[in-house]
Amino acid sequence: MRHANGLAAAAGVLIIAGAPAIAAPLNPKTVPDSARWVMHVDLEAGASTQIGRFLLDAIDEDSDGYKDIRQGLPGFTLAPEGGIHGMTIFGRSFGDDGPEQFVAYIDGDQRIGAWGDQIDAALRQAGQDSATIEVEGRRAWGIPIEDGDTTIFATLLAKGDARTWVISNDLLKVSQAAAFVEKGGGDGGALDGFEWRPGTVAMVGVKDPSEVADFDEMSAVIGQAKSIVARVGERDGVFFAEAKAVTEDPSGADQIARVLDGFVALGSMMQSNDPELARLMRFAHSLKISGDNGAVRVTFEHDAGEVLGLIKELKDEGEHDVELHFGHDDDEGDDD
């Protein structure tokens, strides 16, 4: 059963992580124009940056979930050393428990191509039948996740040394997406027209957010946005984060920008009485906000080493808070 649980955990991670058919930058031809939300991550680019390498190592060290995943997929890691190069996930809507329907691509090398055999071996060891099925002439794997009501389906594409897993919670979509990857014809969906800046590690886009359930409130905040796009990365030792929202009301974009500027100014005034806020406001001078032609743009560029220092501080403080919390519980138990 431990191996079966590991496969379920692996399937759950794939839902969260997503993946790309072509190593970054994103190949828009692999994402249909019907995709209302898209997320793309270039793990190779991330591992080459100060911040990305730290976060990948931290996830590897701290994630208890990896212990279960590795029962089914030995050596699994999100770092490129595990064979994964990049990730893309997209869909049309979100429900309360996440994407209602999604397609994900995981791009990598021959190491991830071995996952199928590893899944079968783990199932046999757990006393279960092979998870393989056939759909429209393609070999696919069906893996039930822990809630028992959902099955994740996946098929493997190979071209030279490259491997791509096509994953979905809909069996038919797995076959359709695999054919789409092979033939192309997409435009990038919600990331259509958003250029891949050198050094980009991750991009996310939402098209018509008012029609994507979990983005309703966000859309109201930025003036009934028609689209939201953002990217983060690191280039030549500089961390950057950029976001753009195209609104329905061109005249309102400048007003929204002024409101955001006002929040930054308010933070500057309040920081003298709040050490935590003061620490964050050290970076405020690197934040630029503008509104023009119906678009609100927010950009942040700062020395990557200093940003990494802040991330490490916050991580250490979070671990310290957890230790204090559990230590307090233990003390209470000793008093009883």
Predicted regions and their residues:
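Structural boundary/hinge residues at secondary-structure and domain interfaces
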Residues: 22-142, 147, 194-221, 258-283, ...
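Broad, structure-driven detector of short, well-ordered beta-strand segments within folded domains
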Residues: 85-92, 150-158, 220, 226-234
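A conserved glycine-rich beta-strand in the N-terminal activation segment of trypsin-fold
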Residues: 151-218, 222
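Bacterial N-terminal signal peptides that target proteins for export
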Residues: 1-10
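Intrinsically disordered, low-complexity segments enriched in Gly and acidic/Ser/Thr residues
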Residues: 221-291
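Bacterial N-terminal signal peptides
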Residues: 9-18
